[in-house]
Amino acid sequence: MSVAGGEIRGDTGGEDTAAPGRFSFSPEPTLEDIRRLHAEFAAERDWEQFHQPRNLLLALVGEVGELAELFQWKTDGEPGPQGWSPRERAALQEELSDVLIYLVALAARCRVDLPLAVLSKMDINRRRYPAHLARSSSRKYTELPHGAISEDQAVGPADIPCDSTGQTST
């Protein structure tokens, strides 16, 4: 659980969070808010020097590992996260938050505008996995019947690579 301005945010533990059906995120904080909060946090501790893309990626992978540990050894017969104990739900919320924070920090360091990148990638995915060909199928787009596009046809906007300092290279 996170605390913002003295208010507990996130999983309220109420029935709505465990109810099946539609879920939507809070409108705030935005990804830009998260980027700024993390940048301020790191600056206050003089940690920017350690936040090279490689280090941020390794920290992200470590947090994904901690998230995976929450699911490890659970059986298919056990309830999903909605049925977990409040302690397990709090751990889930913290690890998902850590993953998002490091993902946003890595994207910022590499100068990738995540909201725009997501829109571009979803467009590519729609072309790779047309609903009429991919519905109820777990097959990769290269294995779908004729009509799905190939990888070389699904090229998105030009990437702007970053060097080890996080600066864009030209």
From Swiss-Prot:
Probably binds two or three Mg(2+) ions per subunit. One of its GO terms (biological process) is DNA protection. The keyword Mitochondrion applies. Its main location: mitochondrion. It is found in: Mitochondrion; Nucleus; Cytoplasm, Cytosol. GO terms for cellular component: cytosol; mitochondrion; nucleoplasm; nucleus. Residues 1-27, 147-170 are annotated as: Disordered. Its EC number is 3.6.1.12. Substrate binds at residues 38, 47-51, 73, 102. Inhibited by the reaction end product PPi. Inhibited by dCDP. Inhibited by triptolide. Hydrolyzes deoxynucleoside triphosphates (dNTPs) to the corresponding nucleoside monophosphates. Has a strong preference for dCTP and its analogs including 5-iodo-dCTP and 5-methyl-dCTP for which it may even have a higher efficiency. May protect DNA or RNA against the incorporation of these genotoxic nucleotide analogs through their catabolism. This is dCTP pyrophosphatase 1.
